[in-house]
Each structure stands twice: as structure tokens, then as C-alpha cells.
Curated annotation (Swiss-Prot):
The protein's name: Bifunctional protein GlmU
Gene behind the chain: glmU
Superkingdom as given in the UniProt entry: Bacteria
NCBIfam families, per database record: glmU (TIGR01173), PRK14353.1 (NF010933)
Pfam families to which the protein is assigned, alphabetical: Hexapep, NTP_transf_3
GO biological process: cell morphogenesis; cell wall organization; lipid A biosynthetic process; peptidoglycan biosynthetic process; regulation of cell shape; UDP-N-acetylglucosamine biosynthetic process
Binding site for UDP-N-acetyl-alpha-D-glucosamine: 11-14, 25, 78, 83-84, 144, 158, 173, 230, 319, 337, 352, 363
Organism of this sequence: Rhodopseudomonas palustris (strain HaA2)
Subunit-level organization: Homotrimer.
Membership in a protein family: In the N-terminal section; belongs to the N-acetylglucosamine-1-phosphate uridyltransferase family.
Length: 452
């Protein structure tokens, strides 16, 4: 069977005024990934699949994000907002380039799946001219109704134009559409603007196709999958749906989530086998978790690689650039950033490790700080294999602690320490016998009321 080519046009020109944000609507995140990125990741991206993204004026950030996800993306600007068909024809050059299937999607529908795009194309393979994605709405008020006759799409009826019987229809238009690429440019060009708003509506393509004796059809999907995001409340709703999906997928893959509804995952989180995550854990973008890892409650992890059988938290914060080797441990109230912590190393309590490399089997005592920033630049701390850093130590970078070296508790280390050496930097202890008794007696005498 010959593989069909495709062109997906993603409409992302909306201002998103109801978001009340300076950030373009399609760049707001769901599960740590911009809305647009979810759509582009789901769109066909094989050898014969092309992508065009239609953006608004002054939306260079949207173009940059599109090319970050899909370097092959063609960018087109819709200078005027004159309806959905007008937006599609902003990419007229791409449509004219030819493809077997033209897919039209929206940059603010992050829950759409690759499987749905594939199902949308199937009727075109079987001779259909146009396919609309529909959903059964719990409350269809405000949606265009899909009027189906003899298993074919007869019309898309907007609510204001619907008859009483048509208003009872719960099958609604999701806006996503597929058109036979051979007729796409002709059909789109035939759409007029003879309506109250003077705009060009993509939904008119259904009538044009039927007038030409061609077949229009409907593919149904779940209502959640085609949620459009126009407000912060809708953004939160989409986040909830996405999180439920991600948790379910993680558990299906063998991850133990002790209290799933309290755990936040990112769209790109990857898991090994037998991973356990306790309640109230937040995992941001860029995290990979190895076999047997345990993440304890109230930990926050971003852009981090965890090796096999690692242990994190509770109350740990792992910031970007952190990597842990197999069996390494990060304990409670520990923060790391740009830190490589090798196999078997332990950082158990109340510690900051930034811009550092900790060798295998090293032990970092409670209250240790790598002093990595001098007010202008960051500097690196190197701690060798098997080194032992005593509690309440400050390691002033750049500095190297040799393999097997010991650092005495309370030390401020400013110079390199050789392998297997002991470094202690603190004043000699002074003991004054009886001082506490004399101090208390003097204070009590001072508190006696004066004779008067």
C-alpha cells in the first residue's frame, strides 16, 4: 500500500485576549509543554508529512516554538483575522505545494492525539472528500451541530441557524478537518464571506463539497480531546485531563503512584521499571527516572536524570542539570542544581549542591554548602570518590576535594584538598571551667530588686 502524504496546517494566530496574559495563548503550558507543542507532537511527522503553522503578527515566539518542536515547520502570518478559512489560506502556498491529505487543526487543543489524526485521514483513503472531527457534547449549547444523513455529513449548522430538531443534536463540530488534497485549494478558494460578519468560514467547505457530489463524513472522538483553551479556567481543566492521562499511562507501565491525584507529571517524563512515587511530588519537564527509584513526598524535580535504585526526598528540590548515578541518595531539604552525583553517593540532609561533581560513594554531611557564586560568575566544586564532608561545611568554589579525603565539620574550605587528606578549618576550642555558673550568678544578682 502506497503511503499517503499529508500537509497539516495548525492555526495559531489567535491573540487569546481572554487569557489576560502577555504570553501568546498557544504558548501557555499544559504538563510542562506549550499548547502548540502538544498539537505539533501529535500531528503526522513521517517522511511524507509536511507542517505549516499560521501565526499572528508580532508572534515570533510562536514561530520559534513551532520550529523548536518541528524544524521542518513552514511559518505563515495571518495579517487580518477574517475567519478560519481565511486563516487556512494564509498558508495557500503550502496547500498549493500538494499533498494527498490536508489536515486543519488548532494550536489551542493540546489534548488531541496522533491516533485521532490517523483516524481522520482514513476516510480520505477510502474515497471521501472531506472529514470533520465531531464529539458528543454533554451540553451542546453554543457549538455547531453536525447534521448527519445516511452516515454522511449533510451540514454543519451553527446554533443561531439551527431548527428546533437540529438543536437537539448532541454531535458537535470540533473544528478539526481533513480534506482531499487534490481538491483542497479549489474548495477553500470557493468559500465566500456573504454573512453578517463578512468572514470566511471553514465550515462552509462542507456545503461546497456536497454541491459537487462528493462525500463528506464525520469521525467522532471524546469531548475532552478537543477542548479548546480560551481562558485560564479552561487551561486548568485541560491540565487536569492531561495529568489524569499521564498518571494512568505511568501506572499502566508499572509505576507505583501511592496517591495518584496528588502527583504532578510532565508530558515528557520517562520511567524505568518498579519506580515508586509517594504523594505530593511535582515532576517538571526533562525528567527521566531509572528502574527501582523511589521519590518521597513533597519533592520537586525538573530537568534531572535519576539512575537505578536512587532515593529522593522527602522535601528535596532537584533543579535543572542534576544527574544521579545508580544507588545515589538525595535526602530531606536538599537542593541541587547543575550537579552530577555519581553512583552510591549520599547527600542526606539540609544541603545545597550547585555546579558540582560528587564522585562515587562520597558522603556529604548535613548543612554542607557548595559556595558556587561570587556575585558575578558560577564556579565548580569537585568532590572525589569516597570523600567524606563533615556537617556544616562550606566549600568555596572553585575547589577540589580529593578522593577519600575527609573534611572536618564546620570547616570553610577555600583551597584544594589532596586525596586521602584531612582538612579542618576552624578555631581551636576554648573551655573555661565554671564560667557558666559564674555567669548565671552574676545575672541573678543583677535582677534582684533594688532597696527602696
Amino acid at each position: 500500500m502506497t503511503t499517503r502524504t499529508s500537509l497539516t496546517i495548525v492555526l495559531a494566530a489567535g491573540e487569546g485576549t481572554r487569557m489576560r496574559s502577555s504570553l501568546p495563548k498557544v504558548l501557555h503550558p499544559v504538563a510542562g509543554r506549550p499548547l502548540l507543542a502538544h498539537v505539533l507532537a501529535a500531528a503526522p511527522h513521517g517522511e511524507g508529512d509536511k507542517l505549516a503553522v499560521v501565526i499572528g503578527p508580532d508572534h515570533q515566539a510562536v514561530a520559534d516554538e513551532a520550529r523548536r518542536i518541528r524544524p521542518d515547520a513552514q511559518i505563515y502570518v495571518q495579517t487580518e483575522r477574517l475567519g478560519t478559512a481565511h486563516a487556512v489560506l494564509a498558508a495557500k502556498q503550502a496547500v498549493a505545494g500538494g499533498a494527498d491529505d490536508l489536515l486543519i487543526a488548532f494550536g489551542d487543543t493540546p489534548l488531541i492525539s496522533a491516533e485521532t489524526f490517523a483516524r481522520l485521514r482514513e476516510p480520505l483513503r477510502n474515497g471521501g472528500a472531506l472529514v470533520v472531527l465531531g464529539f458528543r457534547a454533554v451540553d451542546p449549547t453554543g457549538y455547531g451541530r453536525l447534521v448527519v444523513e445516511d452516515d454522511r455529513l449533510a451540514a454543519i449548522r451553527e446554533q443561531a441557524d439551527a431548527s428546533p430538531d437540529e438543536l437537539k443534536i448532541t454531535l458537535c463540530n470540533a473544528g478539526v478537518m481533513a480534506i482531499d488534497g487534490r481538491i483542497a485549494l479549489d474548495v477553500l478558494g470557493a468559500i465566500g464571506n456573504a454573512n453578517k460578519k463578512g468572514e470566511y468560514y471553514l465550515t462552509d467547505a462542507v456545503g461546497i463539497v456536497r454541491e459537487r457530489g462528493l462525500v463528506a463524513g464525520v469521525i467522532e472522538t471524546d469531548e475532552d480531546e478537543v477542548r479548546g483553551i480560551n481562558t485560564k479556567a479552561q487551561l486548568a481543566e485541560a491540565e487536569a485531563v492531561m495529568q489524569a492521562r499521564l498518571r494512568q499511562a505511568a501506572m499502566a507501565a508499572g509505576v507505583t503512584l501511592i496517591s495518584p491525584e496528588t502527583i504532578h507529571l510532565a508530558a515528557d517524563t520517562t520511567f524505568g521499571r518498579d519506580v515508586t512515587i509517594e504523594p505530593f511530588v511535582v515532576i517538571g519537564p526533562g525528567v527521566s527516572i531509572g528502574d527501582g527509584a523511589v521519590i518521597h513526598s513533597f519533592s520537586h524535580i525538573v530537568d534531572t536524570s535519576l539512575g537505578k535504585n536512587t532515593s529522593i526526598g522527602p522535601y528535596a528540590r532537584l533543579r535543572p542539570g542534576t544527574s544521579l548515578g545508580d544507588g545515589a541518595k538525595i535526602g530531606n531539604f536538599v537542593e541541587t542544581k547543575a550537579a552530577q552525583i555519581d553512583a552510591g553517593a549520599k547527600v542526606n540532609h539540609l544541603t545545597y549542591i550547585g555546579d558540582a561533581h560528587i564522585g562515587p560513594g562520597a558522603n556529604i554531611g548535613a548543612g554542607t554548602i557548595t559556595c558556587n557564586y561570587d556575585g558575578f560568575n558560577k564556579h565548580k566544586t569537585e568532590i572525589g570518590a569516597g570523600a567524606f564532608v563533615g556537617s556544616n561545611s562550606s566549600l568555596v568554589a572553585p575547589v577540589r576535594i580529593g578522593a577519600g579525603a575527609y573534611i572536618g565539620s564546620g570547616s570553610v574550605i577555600t583551597r584544594n584538598v589532596p586525596d586521602d587528606a584531612l582538612a579542618v578549618e576552624r578555631n581551636d576550642q576554648s573551655v573555661r571551667e565554671g564560667w557558666a555558673t559564674r555567669f548565671r550568678e552574676a545575672k541573678l544578682r543583677a535582677k534582684k530588686p533594688k532597696a527602696g
